[in-house]
Amino acid sequence: MPKYDNSNADQWGFETRSIHAGQSVDAQTSARNLPIYQSTAFVFDSAEHAKQRFALEDLGPVYSRLTNPTVEALENRIASLEGGVHAVAFSSGQAATTNAILNLAGAGDHIVTSPRLYGGTETLFLITLNRLGIDVSFVENPDDPESWQAAVQPNTKAFFGETFANPQADVLDIPAVAEVAHRNSVPLIIDNTIATAALVRPLELGADVVVASLTKFYTGNGSGLGGVLIDGGKFDWTVEKDGKPVFPYFVTPDAAYHGLKYADLGAPAFGLKVRVGLLRDTGSTLSAFNAWAAVQGIDTLSLRLERHNENAIKVAEFLNNHEKVEKVNFAGLKDSPWYATKEKLGLKYTGSVLTFEIKGGKDEAWAFIDALKLHSNLANIGDVRSLVVHPATTTHSQSDEAGLARAGVTQSTVRLSVGIETIDDIIADLEGGFAAI
């Protein structure tokens, strides 16, 4: 009698893998949906078995800070969708980004980044990493590969950027930036939060590591926090410059594992080092429940993202023709400075988070927001519900004037995360906002 078998799930299409990859039917109960394994620890078969798991000879579950069957199912599914060899889930997207950087850089090291960043990432880079002795340089023009090259220093350990920036809504030329990174023997880390693998797969475009907030489009309904890091498995962590290793943490024996060299772990070396080193020590663990919530969202990822983006195109066109709008930042518009990059990369969609400059200033922006009835004014994106926020006084309020300018945020900027409601209702609500100013 035929039985369910997803052992060759990587041969299936994206939508099928969104539902089936990474999770088998529960062996004990035959539960079809993913169970929530709400357990802190897992029983070993023997003393020898316990020793093998602690020595990384067997990568099965030990303690939920490191691995948990519910979380592992999520990680496997995300790795399949993003095209990576290993995924590590975290308690938030910020934790994923932080661990990606700390896996490569320490005191005295340097990171090169696009200036068009989510406000929390900018604060992480400018404040927290600085306290740890890690220097960060913002490239002058992230659309120009030579601007990235000009920012490189002898101690540079990574390049960082966002596929579609929050809130600028530009499109990063990932292949061009990856070429510069690799020319300098460093990896490119891409935040794929707004795109998700449903729209863009950065690892296929030359990136080496992907991070994303699961809180946003992957989960898709504002029900739980989460983050993920995906290892592309292709970067050579043994690379040297002037006869010295660029990434000594990967080729120097780790005393915690009796002399293990992470580079010897092969393709998933980056991801495994994050898991058994940083996640073990910092404890930014994703709960089994939030992992389960994310998996429920991923089931419908492609359907939701298509609706989000079709609605976003219509909203952007509406705003672009409105007399009370000064400017719309949305790469899907043909007059966008990033439309050519979108076409170069062969992208159908450019995300459903966009900003626009309202004519006037903060007072007009606030009046517009306060008059909306369908949109929720809150600090999140990627919800099925349409969302609105004033970035300068919320998500980017910790930035100084230079930081706001880098991110493309002014007092007139309004950010929309376009939901999946009926488009006529979304636009009617926006009309109501404009009528109030």
Swiss-Prot record:
What keywords are annotated for this sequence in UniProt?
Answer: Amino-acid biosynthesis, Methionine biosynthesis, Pyridoxal phosphate, Transferase
UniProt-listed Enzyme Commission number(s): 2.5.1.49
* Pfam (any one): Cys_Met_Meta_PP
- Return the protein name: O-acetyl-L-homoserine sulfhydrylase
> For this protein, what reaction is catalysed?
O-acetyl-L-homoserine + hydrogen sulfide = L-homocysteine + acetate; O-acetyl-L-homoserine + methanethiol = L-methionine + acetate + H(+)
Which SUPFAM superfamilies does the record cross-reference, listed alphabetically? Answer: PLP-dependent transferases (SSF53383)
- Function, please? Catalyzes the conversion of O-acetyl-L-homoserine (OAH) into homocysteine in the methionine biosynthesis pathway. Can also use dimethyldisulfide and methanethiol as reduced sulfur sources, leading to the direct formation of methionine. Has weak cystathionine gamma-synthase activity.
Residues carrying N6-(pyridoxal phosphate)lysine: K216
Q: Which cofactor does it need?
A: pyridoxal 5'-phosphate
What the record says about the induction of its expression is:
Expression is repressed by methionine.
Tell me the null mutant phenotype: Disruption of the metY gene is not enough to lead to methionine auxotrophy, but the metB-metY double mutant is unable to grow on a minimal medium lacking supplemental methionine. Deletion of the gene results in methionine auxotrophy on methanethiol or dimethyldisulfide as sole sulfur source.
GO molecular function per UniProt: cysteine synthase activity; O-acetylhomoserine sulfhydrylase activity; pyridoxal phosphate binding
Q: How is its activity regulated?
A: Inhibited by methionine and cystathionine.
Q: Which GO terms describe its biological process?
A: cysteine biosynthetic process from serine; L-homocysteine biosynthetic process; transsulfuration
Query: Which pH dependence is annotated?
Result: Optimum pH is 7.0.
Which pathway features in its UniProt record?
A: Amino-acid biosynthesis; L-methionine biosynthesis via de novo pathway; L-homocysteine from O-acetyl-L-homoserine: step 1/1
User: How does temperature shape the activity of this protein?
Assistant: Optimum temperature is 37-42 degrees Celsius.
Q: How does it assemble?
A: Homohexamer.
Query: Keyword Transferase: yes or no?
Result: yes
Q: Does the keyword Secreted apply?
A: no
Q: Which cysteines are joined by disulfide bonds?
A: none
- Identify the GO cellular component terms for this protein: cytoplasm
